[in-house]
Regions:
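Intrinsically disordered, polar/acidic, low-complexity terminal segments
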Residues: 3-70, 74-112, 154, 163, ...
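Transmembrane alpha-helix segments characteristic
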Residues: 17, 113-120, 217-227, 310-338
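Specific aromatic-rich, kink-prone transmembrane helix
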Residues: 136-159, 168, 191, 197, ...
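Membrane-embedded glycan-lipid processing machinery
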Residues: 31, 83-87, 125-136, 346-350
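Hydrophobic/aromatic-rich transmembrane helices and adjacent perimembrane loops
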Residues: 136-140, 342-367
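Transmembrane-helix signature of polytopic, membrane-embedded enzymes
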Residues: 103-123, 141-142
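Membrane-interface alpha helices of multi-pass inner-membrane proteins
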Residues: 162-194
Length: 456
């Protein structure tokens, strides 16, 4: 491939990705506020400019950037769910652009790059893509990738003017304004990276570089501020177990093991797609454990390759992604075991977090492919890539087939909103996907009185 065609590829594919995502959003959603929007309506509408709703003790857990965007949406657009959905799609596109810029800089091969983008813009994230309340999470991951990219070019000796300042300022902006709960892994992996890089530098030079300490401090301070704010938040987990972990761990240790393995398997084939395939008799349910084991093995092999070939001395980006992906799996296990379902970690809502590690694995293989001498290992890598392509391709196919049904669900919500009195509590809870019929009615009353969203 010529340099001109390669540059075209690196630019065109990250643009085609969000275009596909926006098309999918149009096909699978409609402008109807339900599910998580019920809580948002009751908490912030209609007086979205009220400072008392902004300056609250747990302000950081509510993600401050949401406030001006929500205020604009309500005041100017009449509370458009579609607006939020588009922001989410554009946020994913921005993240893809950052990853694409890294691939262009490192001259990742065309086949590897196309595989990377295929997985990056896959529909295994459908639950996030069709829930506008989570648009900011896509922006957060774009910011994470950008920070990792800046760190990578500084450490590889290709830093730009102002990069050191960026490394110190970005954590304050990202953690305090954009990241929300995702700041835990973002901050944790940066602290690990700075410690690791400081040790590597010390081994080379025989002295400690104070820059790593300052960078780590600039990560730690906003993280502590977030933790203080988070300590004042009150969370509601409908249907969750409220007791301690130890008794459950002793009584049902297998659930935790299955949860962890399945969360990795979900990155090959999303939960609903897997269940469809099992129900149709395409494959046994036990396949999820094989897929999960294969992904876990890929993590370990990619980590070993980074260390064996000292890839981190040339580029730290893949190693950071691998560490972040693994930490996300651990975090989801520790925070979501309370639902006592071993398949909960396979949910599409976590694919955005888990795919970070998949990107790191693929980039590691792409950058070291010519250096890997083991033919057996190369065969395993190719088989793993085929598995990822097939599983995610099947997920995309099933989701495209399901999209009209998701859109129809939203249209039914809009129809029901016009005459709520005709429906029972059970019908409202089921269709609006929220646990309280009374709160659904309260939220719809707010929208109706202020001529917002479905009542415009």
């Amino acid at each position: 491939m010529t340099d001109k065609k390669r540059r075209w590829m690196y630019g065109a594919v990250p643009l085609a990705g969000p275009a596909f995502i926006l098309w999918y959003i149009r096909a699978a959603t409609c402008d109807a506020a339900y599910s998580d929007y019920i809580r948002q309506i009751l908490s912030y509408l209609p007086d979205v400019w009220n400072p008392e709703k902004f300056f609250v003790p747990d302000i950081l857990t509510r993600i401050p950037i949401n406030f001006p965007v929500r205020a604009f949406n309500v005041s100017v657009l009449g509370f458009s769910v579609t607006f939020d959905l588009i922001l989410g799609g554009l946020g994913l596109g921005l993240a893809g652009f950052v990853v694409g810029a890294y691939c262009r800089k490192r001259q990742v091969g065309p086949v590897w790059f196309l595989l990377l983008m295929f997985l990056f813009f896959g529909l295994n994230k459908w639950e996030m893509l069709t829930n506008g309340t989570g648009w900011v999470h896509f922006l957060a991951f774009a910011c994470f990738y950008y920070h990792y990219l800046v760190l990578d070019r500084v450490e590889s000796g290709e830093g730009k003017r102002g990069d050191e300042l960026r490394l110190r300022v970005l954590p304050f902006v990202i953690t305090l304004c954009i990241a929300g709960p995702y700041c835990a892994v973002y901050s944790g992996v940066l602290l690990l990276a700075y410690g690791f890089l400081a040790a590597v530098n010390y081994k080379k030079t025989g002295r400690w570089d104070g820059r790593y300490g300052w960078r780590a401090l600039c990560v730690l301070v906003p993280l502590l501020l977030y933790m203080v704010s988070n300590s004042m938040a009150v969370y509601e987990h409908t249907g969750a177990y409220t007791g301690p972990m130890l008794p459950v761990l002793l009584e049902r240790p297998g659930m935790f093991v299955k949860f962890f393995i399945k969360s990795f398997g979900g990155m090959v084939m999303e939960k609903e797609t897997l269940e469809f395939g099992v129900n149709m008799g395409y494959f046994p349910y036990a396949l999820v454990y094989l897929m999960g084991g294969a992904v876990m093995a890929a993590y370990l092999i990619a980590l070993w390759l980074n260390l064996k070939y000292r890839l981190y001395e040339r580029t730290i980006f893949p190693l950071i992604l691998i560490a972040a992906g693994g930490m996300n799996h651990v975090l989801i296990l520790l925070s979501r075991w309370i639902f006592l379902r071993d398949d909960y970690g396979m949910s599409a809502r976590y694919a955005l977090q888990f795919q970070v590690g998949i990107l790191g694995i693929i980039l590691t293989c792409a950058l070291l492919w010519k250096e890997i001498r083991s033919r057996a290992l190369k065969v395993l890598v190719v088989c793993w890539c085929v598995m990822m392509t097939a599983g995610n391709g099947f997920t995309d196919y099933r989701e495209l087939k399901t999209a009209p049904g998701r859109k129809a669900w939203g249209k039914t919500v809009k129809e029901m909103a016009g005459h709520l009195e005709d429906y029972t509590d059970e019908e409202l809870v089921y269709q609006f996907q929220y646990g309280s019929a009374d709160k659904i009615r309260q939220a719809m009353k707010i929208l109706e009185d202020n001529h917002l969203n479905m009542y415009r």
